[in-house]
Amino acid sequence: MKAIIIIAGSEFVQGRKQDKNGLFIAKNLFERGVDVQGIIISPDSHYELLNYIKFALDRADLVFISGGLGPTTDDNTRMAVSEAIGVPLIYNEEWLNKLKTYYKSNNVEITEERKSMAKIPYGSAIIENPVGRAVGFIKVLDDIKKAVVALPGVPSEMEPMFYKALEMLNINEKKRYTKLFRVFGIKELDLNYLLNDMKDLSYNFSPKGIDVFLYDTTLESFKEKEKKIKDRLGTFIYAEDNLEMEEVVGKLLRENKKTVATAESSTGGLIVSRLVNVPGSSGYVLGGIVSYVNEVKINLLKVNEEDIKNFGAVSEPVAKQMVEGVRNLINSDLAVSDTGIAGPTGESPNKPLGLHYIGFTDGKETKVYKEIYQGSRNDVRLYISQFALNLIRLYLISNS
């Protein structure tokens, strides 16, 4: 069985927002033995959506559409599906009554636009929305043995409705077992050496490390491979499935009742920004200093001016004094620092682009690590932030 996923939203086409629904739908379909032929990102335009739906129906058995079911003028999914399959839109009376009850109880007028969220193509089955107002639907095209599934774009609404759609389509049974291992601190060649005897693996490389994707069609074989990967990679695995490094570090900081502070130069606050992205981070993040210029390093972090003159701002002594300075200033349990050359300029004969020194201290011992990572400016900064967060993780798992 083949599927094509259509994500409706001009915000994705214009690069203002990153889609995650397509990945969620694709992963779950893959696990159930459905081969996804592609993910199409469409603007909100009725014309474009219509053409993409026709394109998908020509090539796939299942067409999943996420987004475009709201009450505004740019929500065109219902009409586009209706036109693509040649049936009119009708009100689902059950859902319309629920909308009327909801808006009446909230003293909100039930306008024609709001009523439109109860419209579905004739002959469709509704997928009730447990969270929001827009109803989803499945339209089975018996004559060509295909189906169109329309879901909202809000992930908290889409995900439970997607699982309900799978039940309604009778494709809920898992036929493939999958697992994502997120890995950091090991080189690509070393990883390949450790896992080169294993099939059914795929890799994705980024400044945040390596994602190792395992899949298998039998549970016994899957479990065997899963154990091998864990045994061979050990603490290089920082997360399983889609957790980010900052989420893992945040959990460890909470569990170990530790606080952290940062002193950043090259990363420009990215380390502390990632830490505070996690809800509840105020319980363990005390603060951060962006010491981008030498004066801030000297005046706030008490870095020795002579050391900057003798060794340069990008040096081991400076990284060491930065991390110790911020810990003393903010009075945290742990601290990390970075100083480096993110590029694309700033290199010298002895200091190449990408050179960084990353400091870590727990107040008893301070260590400084030298790293060279070359890429775009933002890729370098992202890698260094990941490296610094990983230092916190490794310390906490070895001192728990």
From Swiss-Prot:
It comes from the Bacteria. This is CinA-like protein. HAMAP family: CinA_B. SUPFAM superfamilies: CinA-like (SSF142433), Molybdenum cofactor biosynthesis proteins (SSF53218). Belongs to the CinA family.
